[in-house]
A protein has these predicted regions:
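Long, non-catalytic architectural segments outside compact domain cores
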Residues: 1-33, 76-83
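Charged, low-complexity interaction regions
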Residues: 23, 48-55
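Non-transmembrane amphipathic alpha-helical segments
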Residues: 37-45, 65
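N-terminal secretory/membrane-targeting helices
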Residues: 44-45, 59, 77
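Short, charged, amphipathic alpha-helical segments
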Residues: 55-64
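Amphipathic alpha-helical coiled-coil segments
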Residues: 67-79
C-alpha cells in the first residue's frame, strides 16, 4: 500500500531525522517518533533524579520537550492524505 503523507507532517518528522517513504505505514512512523519522545522524557527524568537539573525547572523542560513533538498530538489518520 502507498501512503501520501501531508507536507506538514513530513516537515515535523524530518526535524527528528524521520523520513518515511511512500510504503512506510503511519503507525510505524508514529511509533518511531513516539519512541524518540519517550527516550528524551526518560533522560530528562533521570537528570532530575541525579540532581543535574533542579526540580523547579523540570516542568518547564518537559513543556519545552512536548513543544518539540507537536506531530504526536495529531491523530494518525491525519498524517496521510487521500488524493
Amino acid at each position: 500500500m502507498e501512503y501520501k503523507y501531508r507536507e506538514s507532517v513530513l516537515s515535523e518528522l524530518s526535524r527528528h531525522g524521520i523520513v518515511p517513504g511512500p510504503e512506510t505505514p503511519p503507525d510505524l512512523a508514529h511509533d518511531f517518533v513516539n519512541d524518540l519522545y519517550r527516550y528524551e522524557i526518560r533522560a530528562l527524568r533521570e537528570q532530575l533524579r541525579s540532581g543535574l537539573i533542579p526540580k523547579s525547572q523540570y516542568a518547564s523542560r518537559v513543556e519545552d520537550l512536548r513543544k518539540r513533538y507537536p506531530v504526536l498530538s495529531l491523530p494518525k489518520d491525519y498524517w496521510t492524505r487521500s488524493d
